[in-house]
């Protein structure tokens, strides 16, 4: 098989990233201290990121940076500053949730490759077209999809020059990524801001079935589903786990690397998955991939199940087990973990992410060119001015001036450590422009002979007036029994359509056709036939206006020329998100996210003729 399958690994800190690299990851994804959906991970500084990129590239491994949270209005300046820094790194892509960030990157930082985060809940073909339109080159498909759905969506993605990722190992959430508000509502920590409190792992009152953790799903594992994922032409197999340590990352990535290599080389799978059970797990399920959604997907233990698994395997072999044997099994598991950990530490011990030191030596002699010699552990080169130095009594170059002009180097992976002025004579003149040109050329060479991209100032968005002088009333109904309200008010009445149409949507087509003032309200999740039926509603009713929480339906409405409004579950939280929807897909208005407060909403600037 000639097609490359990317193994994409998590990196919550520098050690975990090193572990992923030596274990055979083709790419790693990691976050900085801000703007990423794993605040509980250690994360990286910008200097560490640059060192990680250099190290990863030496091993043929790519680095993707997670900027996968929604952004608040006051954060525009901070994210713009960061993007200005990122364009002068060699980062291979950024992983994005915020719709406004797509707009900023597409307009002002087009050299950055943008990947759509799992937080964008991508599960139907319209959403892939939507994301391609706003600038995504890769999408992460929702974990809830089955294999035929993944295959179909990957085909659609490839038709639009978009790559697909699928999570193949790690934690599963009880809700769709990007559509879980339990943490936000219960304790005020939004998962869309990287602060999920994991309510699905909490203990609740014991259920009738005797479970204390009724929302706790087993971990995802597609270890034996590799042939089907290859057949689906998925581009990237993604491992979850940026909160996990280096030992976990190394073990999982190493196990998956061997599985992929075995299948690519021989067409055969490795049957032994025991190492996956030796690191943190909640037992495993592939129920979503198989489309087999049952109670067996759940486990009444949110903590590490590796010890329970080892004891169960020993019990199966012997039909019974004693306390002494349990202790022996425990010791064996700890020893196995130690072996894997020591193997990992031996491999990463000498991996270095520190910046390469640079020493500058200057030479200034009358009648000769001004010379700068650049020395690094990996390369040395010398540059000269075009003009010859002249003796003068005034305006001569000085050590102080040279130190100021050469106070640093504009390179993400180099640091200036020393200046040597011992060969610089006093009382000599050289045009300052030539000194600046030499500095720029040094930066160019140290930057891999790539021009340093200049700082971009993102202009403030204009403030357009409200469409209506005063706020208007509207209401949302979800039941036929509430249709009488339609006759007693002049307010806009939205009719909430279900996530699942069970068989067909004829019932809802009849309701909407009989009540033309009703405005269809589409849900956030529409998979497979439910998406097809939702599209059929648009095609048969051709409503004048809709509200949609699903970007796939938004794209279809845009194609059909139907006026559409973004629902609150599209998670719009800033002005640039509204600009994206208006400029790219002719959106007419938006319900701002329910997760931000009145003070945060007040500063959002609407596009022209755009209703909030």
Positions of predicted regions on the chain:
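Surface-exposed amphipathic alpha-helical tracts and adjacent flexible/coil segments at the periphery
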Residues: 1-22, 27-34, 38, 53, ...
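Active-site PLP-lysine loop of aminotransferase-like
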Residues: 123
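Glycine-rich, highly charged phosphate/nucleotide-binding loops
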Residues: 44-49
């Amino acid at each position: 098989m000639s097609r490359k399958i990317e193994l994409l690994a998590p990196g919550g800190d520098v050690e975990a990233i090193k572990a992923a690299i030596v274990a055979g990851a083709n790419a790693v994804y990691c976050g900085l201290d801000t703007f990423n959906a794993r605040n509980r991970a250690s994360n990286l500084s910008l200097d560490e990121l640059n060192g990680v990129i250099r190290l990863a590239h030496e091993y043929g491994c790519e680095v993707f940076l997670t900027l996968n949270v929604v952004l608040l209005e006051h954060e525009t300046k901070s994210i713009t500053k960061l993007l200005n820094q990122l364009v002068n790194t060699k980062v291979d892509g950024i992983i994005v949730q915020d719709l406004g960030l797509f707009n900023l990157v597409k307009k002002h930082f087009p050299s950055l490759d943008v990947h759509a985060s799992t937080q964008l809940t991508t599960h139907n073909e319209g959403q892939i077209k939507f994301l391609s339109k706003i600038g995504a080159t890769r999408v992460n498909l929702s974990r809830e999809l089955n294999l035929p759905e993944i295959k179909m969506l990957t085909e659609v993605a490839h038709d639009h020059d978009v790559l697909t990722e699928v999570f193949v190992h790690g934690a599963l959430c009880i809700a769709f990524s990007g559509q879980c508000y339990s943490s936000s509502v219960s304790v005020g920590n939004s998962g869309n801001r990287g602060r999920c409190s994991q309510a699905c792992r909490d203990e609740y009152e014991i259920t009738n079935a005797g479970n204390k953790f009724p929302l706790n799903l087993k971990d995802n594992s597609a270890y034996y589903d590799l042939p089907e994922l290859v057949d689906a032409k998925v581009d990237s197999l993604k491992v979850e786990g940026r909160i996990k340590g280096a030992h976990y990352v190394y073990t999982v990535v190493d196990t998956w690397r061997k599985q992929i290599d075995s299948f690519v080389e021989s067409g055969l799978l490795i049957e032994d998955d025991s190492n996956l059970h030796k690191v943190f797990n909640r037992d495993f399920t592939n129920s979503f991939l198989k489309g087999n959604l049952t109670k067996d997907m759940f486990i009444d233990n949110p903590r590490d199940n590796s010890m329970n698994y080892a004891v169960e395997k020993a019990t199966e072999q012997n039909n019974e087990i004693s306390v002494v044997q349990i202790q022996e099994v425990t010791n064996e598991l700890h020893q196995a973990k130690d072996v894997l950990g020591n193997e990992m530490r031996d491999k990463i011990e000498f991996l270095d992410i520190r910046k390469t030191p640079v020493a500058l030596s200057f030479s200034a002699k009358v009648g000769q060119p001004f010379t700068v010699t650049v020395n690094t552990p990996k390369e040395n080169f010398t540059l000269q001015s075009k003009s010859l130095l002249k003796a003068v009594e005034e305006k001569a170059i000085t050590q102080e001036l040279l130190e100021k002009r050469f106070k640093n180097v504009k390179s993400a992976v180099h640091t200036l450590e020393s200046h040597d002025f011992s060969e610089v004579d006093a009382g000599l003149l050289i045009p300052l422009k030539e000194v600046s040109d030499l500095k720029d050329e040094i930066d160019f060479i140290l930057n891999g002979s790539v021009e340093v991209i200049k700082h971009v100032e993102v202009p403030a968005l204009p403030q357009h007036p409200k469409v209506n002088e005063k706020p208007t009333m509207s209401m949302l109904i979800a039941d036929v029994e509430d249709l009488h309200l339609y006759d007693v008010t002049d307010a806009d009445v939205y009719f909430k359509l279900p996530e699942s149409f069970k068989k067909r949507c004829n019932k809802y087509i009849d309701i909407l056709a009989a009540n033309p003032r009703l405005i269809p309200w589409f849900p956030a999740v529409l998979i497979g036939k439910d998406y097809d039926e939702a599209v059929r509603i648009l095609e048969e009713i051709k409503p004048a206006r809709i509200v949609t929480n699903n970007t796939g339906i938004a794209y279809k409405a845009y194609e059909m020329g139907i006026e559409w409004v973004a629902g609150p579950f599209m998670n719009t939280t800033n002005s640039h998100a509204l600009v994206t929807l208006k400029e790219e897909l002719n959106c007419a208005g938006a319900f701002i996210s329910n997760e931000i407060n009145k003070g945060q909403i007040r500063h959002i600037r609407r596009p022209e003729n755009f209703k909030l």
